[in-house]
Amino acid sequence: CGADAVKLQTYTADTMTIDSDHKDFCIQGGLWDGYKLYDLYKEAETPFEWHKAMFDHARKIDITCFSTPFDETAVDLLEDLNVPAYKVASFEATDLPLIAYIASTKKPLIMSTGMANFEEIEEMVETARGAGCKDLILLHCISSYPAPVDQSNLLTIPDMRKRLGVQIGLSDHTVTNTASVVASVLGATLIEKHFILDRNEKGPDSEFSINPVELTSLCKETKDAWLSLGCAGYERKPAEEANIKFRRSVYFVKDISAGDVITKEHVRRIRPGYGLPPKMEKELIGRKVNKNIVVGTATSWELIDG
């Protein structure tokens, strides 16, 4: 489909929360209304014992595979599997001890910033750097599932890059590719999307996941958007060269005999562009021609006396 990497989530329901019926642990409203936290995470978890096979397969097909650990035991598992990078989820953005533990691996770290204010984002960055992280990317993120596109606030991307001096990407939970394409134009260097093979196969994140066709489109559209930026410049582009001849120029539109004076009835500014530039029309009027000229002849100074 064109993706550069696959990111998993490494947790179990027991490492995320406790199995409790207390109202604090029950979701009210939204996509997962009525779920207990424990039951939702139980449904969505990727068993630890599956990870080795998935990483082995990713290496076999030569695609980068990494994961989001949600506690220290997940980090330890991923270290044993020699994961090349890590991600911190938005909901763990304030878990500074976990961020420090992940950063201490000295591996590249991607951190989502959903729900975090700027002071919290600064704390995340300081914690990661203080624990040894050298390669850091922050993801602008709206932690709503799905996220409303009109609350994307993508102008945060260049602002965050300017303030913090790190690469910025987008963790996109909207249901279309629009926000991701715009983000790439604004300088996002990484786009994250939830992925599902078939939305008819319902899952915890199916409502805001993209399918293979949509992922292929996303990869092409974001790459094209980035390539379209080019650089600021006013020189003619190679792709335009072939069409120069279809510009307007000055042509004889009436037969004229050698020695006659050109009048405005003899010439017009028309396409194609093989004649003198349109701005020279007034210069031609009142001049004499030095040979017989038929209608449809491009003007040139070689045809003019003096």
Predicted regions and their residues:
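Catalytic cores and adjacent flexible loops of soluble metabolic enzymes
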Residues: 1-306
